[in-house]
Protein backbone atom coordinates (compact mmCIF):
# COMPACT_ATOMS: atom_id res chain seq x y z
CA UNK A 1 0.00 0.00 0.00
CA UNK A 2 1.33 3.44 -0.87
CA UNK A 3 2.28 5.83 1.91
CA UNK A 4 -0.33 8.30 0.65
CA UNK A 5 -3.11 5.69 0.76
CA UNK A 6 -1.97 4.75 4.25
CA UNK A 7 -1.95 8.45 5.18
CA UNK A 8 -5.49 8.90 3.87
CA UNK A 9 -6.69 5.92 5.88
CA UNK A 10 -5.02 7.21 9.04
CA UNK A 11 -6.47 10.68 8.45
CA UNK A 12 -9.94 9.19 8.00
CA UNK A 13 -9.64 7.29 11.26
CA UNK A 14 -8.44 10.41 13.05
CA UNK A 15 -11.27 12.58 11.69
CA UNK A 16 -13.84 9.90 12.53
CA UNK A 17 -12.42 9.55 16.03
CA UNK A 18 -12.32 13.32 16.38
CA UNK A 19 -16.04 13.46 15.52
CA UNK A 20 -17.03 10.50 17.69
CA UNK A 21 -15.03 11.41 20.77
CA UNK A 22 -14.94 15.20 20.42
CA UNK A 23 -11.15 15.11 20.25
CA UNK A 24 -8.96 17.52 18.37
CA UNK A 25 -7.92 16.04 15.03
CA UNK A 26 -4.20 16.10 15.73
CA UNK A 27 -4.73 14.52 19.15
CA UNK A 28 -6.94 11.83 17.60
CA UNK A 29 -4.27 11.10 14.97
CA UNK A 30 -1.56 10.83 17.63
CA UNK A 31 -3.78 8.47 19.63
CA UNK A 32 -4.26 6.24 16.57
CA UNK A 33 -0.56 6.28 15.79
CA UNK A 34 0.27 5.38 19.41
CA UNK A 35 -2.01 2.35 19.10
CA UNK A 36 0.04 1.13 16.12
CA UNK A 37 3.45 2.09 17.53
CA UNK A 38 3.57 -1.14 19.53
CA UNK A 39 4.50 -2.99 16.34
CA UNK A 40 1.16 -4.79 16.02
CA UNK A 41 0.96 -3.50 12.46
CA UNK A 42 4.57 -3.88 11.22
CA UNK A 43 3.84 -2.63 7.71
CA UNK A 44 2.49 0.68 9.02
CA UNK A 45 4.88 3.59 8.67
CA UNK A 46 4.06 5.29 11.97
CA UNK A 47 6.87 7.82 11.86
CA UNK A 48 7.42 8.39 8.16
CA UNK A 49 5.66 9.76 5.11
CA UNK A 50 2.28 8.19 5.92
CA UNK A 51 2.06 9.99 9.24
CA UNK A 52 3.31 13.25 7.75
CA UNK A 53 0.70 13.11 4.98
CA UNK A 54 -2.06 12.12 7.43
CA UNK A 55 -1.17 15.05 9.68
CA UNK A 56 -1.26 17.43 6.73
CA UNK A 57 -4.67 16.11 5.67
CA UNK A 58 -6.19 16.27 9.15
CA UNK A 59 -4.91 19.78 9.79
CA UNK A 60 -6.02 20.91 6.34
CA UNK A 61 -9.53 19.53 6.72
CA UNK A 62 -9.95 21.02 10.19
CA UNK A 63 -8.55 24.41 9.16
CA UNK A 64 -10.90 24.63 6.18
CA UNK A 65 -13.87 22.69 7.54
CA UNK A 66 -16.53 25.33 6.93
CA UNK A 67 -15.55 25.87 3.29
CA UNK A 68 -15.19 22.13 2.71
CA UNK A 69 -18.58 21.33 4.23
CA UNK A 70 -20.17 24.11 2.17
CA UNK A 71 -18.78 22.58 -1.05
CA UNK A 72 -20.08 19.14 -0.08
CA UNK A 73 -23.50 20.52 0.85
CA UNK A 74 -23.75 22.44 -2.46
CA UNK A 75 -23.18 19.33 -4.57
CA UNK A 76 -24.93 16.64 -2.54
CA UNK A 77 -28.43 16.53 -3.94
CA UNK A 78 -31.09 15.71 -1.33
CA UNK A 79 -28.44 14.97 1.30
CA UNK A 80 -27.67 17.28 4.17
CA UNK A 81 -24.36 16.79 5.92
CA UNK A 82 -26.22 15.87 9.10
CA UNK A 83 -27.78 12.86 7.31
CA UNK A 84 -24.54 11.49 5.87
CA UNK A 85 -22.75 8.56 7.46
CA UNK A 86 -19.75 9.93 9.37
CA UNK A 87 -17.33 7.68 7.49
CA UNK A 88 -18.64 8.89 4.13
CA UNK A 89 -18.64 12.51 5.24
CA UNK A 90 -15.04 12.34 6.41
CA UNK A 91 -13.90 10.61 3.21
CA UNK A 92 -15.60 13.43 1.29
CA UNK A 93 -13.93 16.05 3.49
CA UNK A 94 -10.50 14.56 2.85
CA UNK A 95 -11.08 14.39 -0.89
CA UNK A 96 -12.52 17.91 -1.12
CA UNK A 97 -9.50 19.21 0.78
CA UNK A 98 -7.23 17.54 -1.78
CA UNK A 99 -9.27 18.84 -4.72
CA UNK A 100 -9.17 22.46 -3.57
CA UNK A 101 -5.97 22.78 -1.57
CA UNK A 102 -3.53 20.25 -3.06
CA UNK A 103 -2.81 21.26 -6.67
CA UNK A 104 -0.04 18.65 -6.83
CA UNK A 105 -2.55 15.77 -6.63
CA UNK A 106 -4.52 15.14 -9.86
CA UNK A 107 -8.31 15.20 -9.55
CA UNK A 108 -8.72 11.64 -10.83
CA UNK A 109 -6.20 10.35 -8.29
CA UNK A 110 -8.06 12.06 -5.45
CA UNK A 111 -11.40 10.62 -6.55
CA UNK A 112 -10.02 7.11 -7.13
CA UNK A 113 -8.30 7.10 -3.75
CA UNK A 114 -11.49 8.26 -2.01
CA UNK A 115 -13.43 5.43 -3.68
CA UNK A 116 -10.83 2.86 -2.61
CA UNK A 117 -10.89 4.11 0.99
CA UNK A 118 -14.70 4.00 0.89
CA UNK A 119 -14.59 0.37 -0.25
CA UNK A 120 -12.49 -0.49 2.78
CA UNK A 121 -14.19 1.61 5.47
CA UNK A 122 -17.64 2.53 4.18
CA UNK A 123 -20.92 0.75 3.60
CA UNK A 124 -21.73 -1.16 0.43
CA UNK A 125 -23.14 1.92 -1.32
CA UNK A 126 -20.46 4.32 -0.05
CA UNK A 127 -18.16 4.16 -3.09
CA UNK A 128 -20.95 5.10 -5.51
CA UNK A 129 -22.25 7.83 -3.20
CA UNK A 130 -18.80 9.36 -2.78
CA UNK A 131 -17.99 9.05 -6.48
CA UNK A 132 -21.19 10.89 -7.42
CA UNK A 133 -20.58 13.84 -5.13
CA UNK A 134 -16.87 14.11 -5.94
CA UNK A 135 -17.55 13.98 -9.69
CA UNK A 136 -19.98 16.87 -9.27
CA UNK A 137 -17.45 18.88 -7.29
CA UNK A 138 -14.49 18.06 -9.55
CA UNK A 139 -16.40 18.90 -12.74
CA UNK A 140 -16.71 22.49 -11.57
CA UNK A 141 -12.94 22.83 -11.08
CA UNK A 142 -10.34 23.67 -13.70
CA UNK A 143 -7.91 20.90 -14.57
CA UNK A 144 -4.80 20.75 -12.42
CA UNK A 145 -1.47 21.17 -14.14
From Swiss-Prot:
- CDD domains noted in UniProt: Terminator_NusB (cd00619)
For this entry, list what GO says about its biological process: DNA-templated transcription termination; transcription antitermination
Q: Which Pfam families match?
A: NusB
Superkingdom is Bacteria
UniProt entry keywords in alphabetical sequence: RNA-binding, Transcription, Transcription antitermination, Transcription regulation
Q: Please give the SUPFAM superfamilies that the UniProt record associates with this protein.
A: NusB-like (SSF48013)
Q: What is an example of a GO molecular function annotated in this UniProt entry?
A: RNA binding
- According to its record, what are the GO cellular component terms? cytosol
Record function comment:
Involved in transcription antitermination. Required for transcription of ribosomal RNA (rRNA) genes. Binds specifically to the boxA antiterminator sequence of the ribosomal RNA (rrn) operons.
Family per similarity comment: Belongs to the NusB family.
Q: Which NCBIfam families match?
A: nusB (TIGR01951)
The record's PANTHER family line, in alphabetical order, gives: ANTITERMINATION NUSB DOMAIN-CONTAINING PROTEIN, N UTILIZATION SUBSTANCE PROTEIN B-RELATED
What is the recorded name of this protein?
Answer: Transcription antitermination protein NusB
Protein species of origin? Geotalea daltonii (strain DSM 22248 / JCM 15807 / FRC-32)
Amino acid sequence: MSSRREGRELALQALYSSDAESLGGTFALKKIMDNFADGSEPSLDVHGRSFTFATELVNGVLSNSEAIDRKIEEKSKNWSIARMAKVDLNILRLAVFELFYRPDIPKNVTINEAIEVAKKFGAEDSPAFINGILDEIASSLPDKE
